[in-house]
Amino acid sequence: MIHLGHILFLLLLPVAAAQTTPGERSSLPAFYPGTSGSCSGCGSLSLPLLAGLVAADAVASLLIVGAVFLCARPRRSPAQEDGKVYINMPGRG
């Protein structure tokens, strides 16, 4: 089961990532990939694009949850037909 602390961490992770400035040097070693410190070719995302990405992510997540719900729910067993004649069951035929 997922703990509330993990959900809170996942919700606050984008906020922490947004607080960092592009090109900021990290405390990782220089040989670590992606720590050059430059942000050439990086651009800020426009607000409508960012809102669209968040909305698309939410819709995709809801579709996945719906598909899992439909596939994982218990199936109904077919109704028994009492009109059948059973040889070894007295009183039913």
From Swiss-Prot:
Residues 70-93 are cytoplasmic. The modification Phosphotyrosine is found at Y86. Residues 19-48 are extracellular. Its main location: membrane. One of its GO terms (biological process) is regulation of immune response. Residues 86-89 are annotated as: PIK3R1 binding site. It is a single-pass type I membrane protein. Predominantly expressed in hemopoietic cells such as NK cells, subset of T-cells and monocytes. Detected in leukocytes, spleen, and thymus. Residues 1-18 form the signal peptide. It is found in: Membrane. The chain crosses the membrane at residues 49-69. One of its GO terms (molecular function) is protein-macromolecule adaptor activity. It comes from the Eukaryota. Keywords: Disulfide bond, Glycoprotein, Membrane, Phosphoprotein, Signal, Transmembrane, Transmembrane helix. GO terms for cellular component: cell surface; plasma membrane. Transmembrane adapter protein which associates with KLRK1 to form an activation receptor KLRK1-HCST in lymphoid and myeloid cells; this receptor plays a major role in triggering cytotoxicity against target cells expressing cell surface ligands such as MHC class I chain-related MICA and MICB, and UL16-binding proteins (ULBPs); these ligands are up-regulated by stress conditions and pathological state such as viral infection and tumor transformation. Functions as a docking site for PI3-kinase PIK3R1 and GRB2. Interacts with CLEC5A. Forms an CLEC5A/TYROBP/HCST trimolecular complex depending almost solely on TYROBP. Homodimer; Disulfide-linked. Heterohexamer composed of four subunits of HCST/DAP10 and two subunits of KLRK1. Interacts (via transmembrane domain) with KLRK1 (via transmembrane domain); the interaction is required for KLRK1 NK cell surface and induces NK cell-mediated cytotoxicity. Interacts with PIK3R1 and GRB2. Interacts with CD300H. Silencing of HCST suppresses cytolytic activity of T-cells and NK cells. This is Hematopoietic cell signal transducer. The gene is HCST.
